[in-house]
Amino acid sequence: IYRGLVGSEMCIRDRYSVRDEAFVADNEIVEKNGKKYNSFGSELSWVEEESYFFRLSKWQDKLLDFYKNNPYFIVPKSRSNEVIKFVESGLKDLSVSRTTFKWGIDVPTDEKHIVYVWLDALTNYISALDYPNKNSDLYQKYWPGIHVVGKDIIRFHAIFWPAFLMAAELDPPKQIVAHGWWTNEGQKISKSLGNVIDPKELIDEYGLDSVRYLSLIHI
């Protein structure tokens, strides 16, 4: 991890999705009605600030070797191909701190910076298992584990997270299972969008087994 300064090539200068808490590559930006969005329909804002960076580029070849040696690490195959193609296109170093957030975990050596959410959030998978005590019953029983995640956060789990773990000389997860979304009129069902369908109403109308079947075939 190293510090990049404002005005240098190593500060953040990128499009950012607040809803997805993620930066977006130029080739993934969609322009509509004079505004910029990511491929999932989240509006993007421009961010330029000082940041600490994780040297993700260092782990590109190691990640590709890992995927090759573990062909079922990411399922289904379509998601695996998506991740591999993204890594092969070239990984940029990853911003792991922000200076504009009002709350969060302080960077220990620089209280001006807050740890980027996906760095501290991903570590919950092992901190909840008593890490760094790798001899604990919880850690021994559950790690490495299987992650079941939505397709919109697969890069965090299948690229960033394994790279963080490799850098810490820890085992990556056993497998990443990426599922699709339930949609409403073509949009992802989300509480933030207010387009959630009440499953109780569906069950009362069509029965539990029908709702189970409908849910599974569309995920």
What are these regions (language model features)?
Residues 1-7, 12, 217-218:
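Single conserved hydrophobic/aromatic residue that forms the stacking wall/gate
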Residues 8-9, 13-30:
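Cys/His-rich Zn2+-binding cysteine-cluster or related metal-binding knuckle/ribbon modules and their
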Residues 16-18, 36-217:
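Structured secondary-structure scaffolds
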